[in-house]
Amino acid sequence: MKLSKTFLFITALCCATPTLAIQNSTSSSGEQKMAMENTQNIREIYLAGGCFWGMEAYMERIHGVKDAISGYANGNTEKTSYQMIGLTDHAETVKVTYDANQISLDKLLKYYFKVIDPTSVNKQGNDRGRQYRTGIYYQDGADKAVIGQALAQLQTKYKKPVQIEVQPLKNYIVAEEYHQDYLKKNPNGYCHIDITKADEPVIDEKDYPKPSDAELKAKLTPLQYSVTQNKHTERSFSNEYWDNFQPGIYVDITTGEPVFSSNDKFESGCGWPSFTKPIIKDVVHYETDNSFNMQRTEVLSRAGNAHLGHVFDDGPKDKGGLRYCINSASIKFIPLAEMEKAGYGYLIQSIKK
């Protein structure tokens, strides 16, 4: 039987429609799953640290923080106000909403610790009273262990006992609109903390574990292994990064831990990459090197304990006077444009474009 063109068109359309519907349904389902996963990664923690104006503005500057709201927490009543918190025993508290894929609770707490006096009782900066006490209030029971470990590590840095209150969240009330985004509305308003400390990166050693020796031998080139593990030195002026001045970061070739920034790189004329300082002071350590009948200060990476190079006191005087002379074979350059994809998005704000 011969079929008409009209019949064939209608048949094709009918056959195609269910397939299209299935594709749309599948696409919609996938988008919903992604949205659900993204929502599941959004967490909340409540932080008290003196006047909430500064703490709110500080938290909002941190990579991975999605929102910060000023409020009152862990008082004795379900209602309060700015005028009443002295009577209801609420603490000025910032509700911090963050993406756990971008910043962990442990790292977020390290930022928090940078701007409080953890040994002070009912006092932060010039602010005094129970409403200005320090506190970490949680809703997820799993957060309690993370908070406990962070506080134990913090205590090792102080002789006095840490006085930060840790409790499940209760009686949280959002503060009056006047207090929300206060420092955005009043740029010269009162702030007891240096909010620019949020721009100083927190680099967690635990994120960059050291591979085994066998893994290093498989991963590194012979030159990279020789330099990082046996403290050898590559040739000057014929290495990869001595004349590279693109914006980005330099990471330990053995672990991936960030060690230097393009912000601090300069032309020293020595033929090796030269920096005025590490990206933060904690990512390197030093040993005395008496080899070749010289007394030098060796620079090693924190997580990988890899030999990076040496530091000398003939650097730019206006930038501290130091010159970190580093082997290209010990580091890997991550361009600014690739930092987010490579997992270093949290450092982008600290790199000058």
UniProtKB/Swiss-Prot annotation:
Peptide methionine sulfoxide reductase A as annotated region, ranges: 43-196
Enzyme Commission number(s) from the entry: 1.8.4.11, 1.8.4.12
Highest taxon in the source lineage: Bacteria
Family annotation (SUPFAM superfamilies): Mss4-like, Peptide methionine sulfoxide reductase
Record's GO cellular component terms: cytoplasm
Known catalytic reactions: L-methionyl-[protein] + [thioredoxin]-disulfide + H2O = L-methionyl-(S)-S-oxide-[protein] + [thioredoxin]-dithiol; [thioredoxin]-disulfide + L-methionine + H2O = L-methionine (S)-S-oxide + [thioredoxin]-dithiol; L-methionyl-[protein] + [thioredoxin]-disulfide + H2O = L-methionyl-(R)-S-oxide-[protein] + [thioredoxin]-dithiol
Family: In the N-terminal section; belongs to the MsrA Met sulfoxide reductase family.
Protein name as annotated: Peptide methionine sulfoxide reductase MsrA/MsrB
Gene: msrAB
